[in-house]
């Protein structure tokens, strides 16, 4: 009888331990970089008026490699394609030579320093976004990994003004991260992390163009529980605001919809 009771208690303890383990992610893990790993980042911009009429589309694609010596990352093969209207095919790819081999230490805070993009043309906002978005995705997926609990929202930042040198100011009202479940990508068991931030004031002043409006952004990140590597990520954003072009006195209300996918080209 005593043996049966002991076995029952042991079973309950193990069951409880397994249940608690399932509610939190592995603590104290660092990102495992077994050499360079390249990702393809594709982002599409759709520009529309208040009636939903699409008048311009842009697509940016670039190869981002992390895991280089000294914690460096680099960009190659960054191109932009443009199209008018909702259905016209994208035009020829325009190479962004100033980003070919662009290498820096993987530090998101450093990318917000005024001198960081000194080799970029002043109007290269989309290209700057590639750098900021990858840094943000890695920060959300890896930097807050230990703090996440299953189905428990984590408020990672609020009332935070981000000064984007040469571009403008973005105010994060409330960044919410949430570990919403488990999945698989590239043969890896992954934590699926959702991020969102709504009603964020944004003001852009760049190359004679001004835009004042509100941004809503959200997405999902698949993070390997074994290596803490990003295995897949999405980002979506809408910006509605008043746009004033250089040399014009009137403004127009514009709706910019942005969608992006970050996925590994080389699987670890």
Please name every model-derived segment:
Residues 1-5:
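Positively charged n-region of N-terminal signal peptides that target proteins for export
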Residues 23-268:
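Signature of exported/secreted
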Residues 6-8, 234:
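Short helix-onset patch at the extreme N-terminus, typifying the N->h transition
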Residues 9-19:
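Bacterial N-terminal signal peptides
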């Amino acid at each position: 009888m005593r043996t049966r009771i002991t076995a029952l208690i042991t079973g309950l303890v193990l069951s409880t331990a397994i249940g608690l383990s399932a509610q939190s992610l592995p603590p104290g893990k660092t990102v495992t970089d077994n050499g360079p790993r390249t990702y393809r980042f594709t982002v599409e911009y759709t520009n529309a008026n208040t009636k939903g009429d699409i008048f311009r589309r842009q697509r940016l694609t670039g190869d981002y490699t992390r895991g280089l010596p000294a914690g460096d990352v680099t960009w190659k093969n960054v191109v932009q394609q443009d199209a008018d209207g909702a259905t016209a095919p994208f035009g020829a790819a325009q190479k962004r030579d100033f980003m070919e081999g662009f290498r820096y230490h993987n530090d998101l805070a450093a990318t917000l320093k005024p001198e960081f993009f000194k080799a970029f043309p002043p109007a290269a906002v989309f290209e700057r976004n590639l750098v900021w978005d990858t840094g943000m995705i890695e920060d959300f997926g890896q930097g807050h990994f230990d703090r996440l609990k299953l189905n428990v929202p984590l408020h990672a930042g609020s009332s935070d003004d981000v000064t984007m040198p040469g571009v403008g100011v973005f105010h994060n009202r409330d960044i919410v991260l949430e570990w919403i479940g488990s999945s698989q990508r590239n043969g890896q068991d992954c934590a699926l992390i959702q991020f969102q931030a709504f009603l964020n004031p944004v003001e852009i002043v760049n190359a004679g163009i001004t835009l004042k409006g509100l941004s809503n952004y959200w997405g999902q990140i698949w993070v390997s529980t074994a290596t803490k590597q990003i295995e897949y990520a999405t980002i979506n954003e809408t910006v509605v605001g008043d746009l004033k072009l250089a040399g014009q006195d009137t403004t127009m209300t514009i709706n910019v919809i942005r969608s992006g996918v970050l996925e590994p080209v080389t699987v670890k």
